[in-house]
Amino acid sequence: MMRNYNFYTYILTNYNRKVLYTGVTNELEKRLHEHYFGLYSIDGKESFTTKYKCYYLVWYERHQYIQHAIEREKELKAG
């Protein structure tokens, strides 16, 4: 059974708009803050968004179900 919440698929870019990052979250504002301040890393390694300075939100889409948000992220990444 899928749970009914607000989920977001989003795209960030860097200042020069040369790099794109696509992600999914249930708290868009909080997640953007985490990207901007580099608060999310894996095993102490610099995150992709920190490394490439992807701090600019260029697009987002709200979804009612997490599975729909994940499917949309996969579509976007596939091109």
Give the label of every model feature segment.
Residues 1-40, 50-62, 68-74:
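GIY-YIG nuclease catalytic motif and its immediate N-terminal context
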Residues 46:
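Basic, flexible Lys/Arg- and Gly-enriched helix-loop patches that mediate nucleic-acid binding at interfaces
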Residues 76-79:
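Short, intrinsically disordered, charge-balanced linker/junction segments flanking boundaries
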